[in-house]
UniProtKB/Swiss-Prot annotation:
Gene3D superfamilies: P-loop containing nucleotide triphosphate hydrolases, RecF/RecN/SMC, N-terminal domain. SUPFAM superfamilies: P-loop containing nucleoside triphosphate hydrolases (SSF52540). GO terms for molecular function: ATP binding; ATP hydrolysis activity; single-stranded DNA binding. This is DNA replication and repair protein RecF. InterPro entries: AAA+_ATPase, DNA-binding_RecF, DNA-binding_RecF_CS, P-loop_NTPase, RecF/RecN/SMC_N, RecF_2. It holds the Pfam family SMC_N. Keywords: ATP-binding, Cytoplasm, DNA damage, DNA repair, DNA replication, DNA-binding, Nucleotide-binding, SOS response. ATP binds at residues 30-37. It is found in: Cytoplasm. The RecF protein is involved in DNA metabolism; it is required for DNA replication and normal SOS inducibility. RecF binds preferentially to single-stranded, linear DNA. It also seems to bind ATP.
Length: 392
């Protein structure tokens, strides 16, 4: 899988940009704030419909963009993608929302097209599979559990259309169940038939949660094997990384979706009193976590910055291999400032891993001195200046 043509309009600091891309390694270099990271962000957004950097899509639209015929300004990302199952053209427009006086409102409107036909945003996910690494991804290792759950969800949503839809349904039911629990707590009065009132929500949440758990547990086993050996190669050490899934409910030995759903339903019933007192659902996929161990040591808690960054890199490259094994196509690998904070040995091992056949990789750097002559000869280069790409 690779992007052979990318077009941007009024996205971040890009006014207009059309570029043909090769299916190999592409190096984007130039000064800070030139637009290197924004180009990776555009590709990630097209693949996942979300920005890795912003909570509000309206800020994706270039600040001085002008709309047409009085319409609000918009950003446009379009790509022609080659895949094993056949080519596809993907397009997404992000349009600012304005009030009657022309002043910007919160949020933005998304318009999606697949092969020039209107589509839902959720249908875009998985059409183009990407793996993104940024300097802040060390938070996958030492940050809050929500970062690790989000990582698993983005990975699996790209691989499995049913996962992304089940996740959306789970989140909807969770919100409704929590609203009910919170309302009862605030009223300080419970209905006579609490179990009957919650029975439907318990059943629906458990069924959706069981599927999410089954897919997560399966993926963690595969990722642990893939990222484990990659960690050893990058670090040059003797020990492999081991990834452990920490469930917030007692799952016992359950691993299939049906058995996991039953374990969740039992957990909800067992925690009924505590949930009513606190006004929230206390266990389930929305409260789970991952732990990263090397030689029995939790490096999320006790690892050095270099070790944690190496884990994050190994996790991302392992994710790319998982996508290739499961989907038959290697995803597009997006590496932003990947060499910072790595010593020379780790850099050498990492660059050897990046230069792989049938793998389109886009990586950014501020200069070329960090790369070997062999790497520079093998990679296609673009100099990035003020939102423009120049070959060479």
């Amino acid at each position: 899988m690779y992007i052979h043509h990318l077009a941007l309009r009024d996205f971040r600091n890009y006014r207009r940009q059309d570029v043909a891309l090769s299916p190999t390694t592409i190096l984007l270099y130039g000064p800070n704030a030139a637009g290197k990271t924004s180009l990776l962000e555009a590709i990630f957004y097209l693949a996942t419909t979300r920005s890795p950097r912003l909570s509000s899509d309206r800020d994706l639209v270039r600040w001085d963009a002008v709309g047409e015929a009085g319409a609000p300004p918009f950003a446009r990302i379009a790509a022609d993608v080659e895949r094993r199952i056949g080519p596809v053209r993907l397009e997404i427009l992000v349009q600012r929302r304005l009030d009657d006086g022309g002043q910007p409102l919160n949020g933005a409107q998304k318009l999606v097209r697949i092969d020039k036909r209107p589509a839902r945003a959720i249908d875009l996910i998985g059409q183009l599979r990407v793996v993104l690494f940024t300097p802040t991804d060390v938070m996958l290792v030492d940050g809050p559990p929500a970062e690790r759950r989000r990582y698993l969800d983005i990975t699996l949503s790209q691989l499995d259309p049913h996962y992304v839809r089940t996740l959306a349904y789970y989140q909807k039911i969770l919100l409704q169940r929590n609203s009910l629990l919170r309302a009862w707590r605030e009223q300080r009065r419970l209905p006579r038939n609490v179990d009957a009132e919650l029975g439907y929500w318990d059943q629906e949440l458990a069924a959706a949660g069981g599927y999410l758990l089954a897919e997560r547990l399966r993926a963690v086993v595969e990722l642990s094997a893939l990222a484990g050996s990659i960690y050893r190669k990058i670090s040059g050490g003797e020990h492999e990384l081991q990834i452990e899934y920490i469930a917030s409910c007692d799952l016992d030995a359950a691993r299939d979706a049906g058995s996991l759903a039953e374990r969740l339903r039992l957990a909800f019933a067992a925690q009924r009193t505590d949930e009513l007192a606190r006004g929230q659902t206390l266990c389930g996929p929305h409260r789970d976590d991952l732990v990263f161990n090397v030689a029995g040591v939790n490096l999320g808690r006790y690892g050095s910055r270099g070790q944690q960054r190496t884990i994050a890199l190994a996790l991302k490259i392992g994710e790319a291999e998982l996508m290739q094994q499961r989907g038959g196509d290697a995803p597009v690998l997006l590496l932003d400032d990947v060499l910072s904070e790595l010593d020379n040995r780790r850099r050498m091992h990492l660059l050897d891993l990046i230069l792989r056949p049938q793998q389109q990789t886009l990586l950014t750097a501020t200069n070329l001195s960090d790369f070997s002559a062999d790497f520079l000869a093998a990679a296609r280069r673009f100099r990035v200046e003020d939102g423009q790409l120049f070959a060479g």
